[in-house]
Each structure stands twice: as structure tokens, then as C-alpha cells.
């Protein structure tokens, strides 16, 4: 009965090299905004309806609440540490991207103080990928 069926839509081919550069640029901007203690710039990573699943806390829903949480965290931070985010795996289908990455916290001297992994789900909206869900874990032993 395949003759009666409409032909399947052909999925657009994703240029994974280009996509990796685009998503890594988002991670680099996120890290730079954290270092600058600019909560609004960090929150620009997230969609308006995003949900962020952090360590040792309940999920935070919505860009405004995420921004507020980021602002509180940045205001409390007096260590001078900064984070580096790197893509480990990237998967794309249609307008969705799943990124699995690693993060490393460095002290002002550049020494590693903590590390872990994260997963971010991006959706392309108005021609731009925004994070709709993310979560992170630490690989460091409990303090």
C-alpha cells in the first residue's frame, strides 16, 4: 500500500561541524558571562520556558527564575573561580540538539578545583538555538 502513502519527508542534513562551533560558542559566552557576573547574559542561554536541573536543588522553571537563581549564586561567589565548558557529544535531529559536555572549575591560578558533566537540550527558535532543559552533575568527591 505504499503507493497510496505520501512520500516521507526528507530530513534536512545537519552540518555537525558548524553546529558544534555554534553550540561551543554558546558555552563560551555562558562561561564569560559567569566570570563577568552578568546574570542577564548567562540567562540569555535559556528559553523563556526552560527548566534547569541543578545539583542539590529542585528544578528551576522559566527564564526569569533561572536568571534570579544565577544572580544569587554569582552575588555569593567571592572565590574568583571560573568555569570552562566543553562539548563531549552532540546529537541533532530536526530543530533539536542534545549536548553532553564536561565542565571544569578553575581557581584564579588556573588549577582545577572541581569538575563534572552536563546535558543541555536546545531547540531552534526564530533561527537561534536556545536551551530548553539542562542538568549537571559533579564528578568530584563530596566535600
Region spans (language model):
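Short beta-strand edge/turn micro-motifs at domain boundaries
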Residues: 115-142
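Short, low-complexity N-terminal intrinsically disordered segments enriched in polar/charged residues
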Residues: 4-45, 142-143
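A short hydrophobic beta-strand element
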Residues: 94-103
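A solvent-exposed, acidic/Ser-Thr-rich amphipathic alpha-helical stretch
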Residues: 17, 21-22, 39-95
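Short, cysteine-centered beta-strand-loop-beta hairpins and adjacent loop/turn segments enriched
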Residues: 77-78, 105-113
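Solvent-exposed loop/turn segments at secondary-structure junctions
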Residues: 49, 57-59, 104-106, 137-139
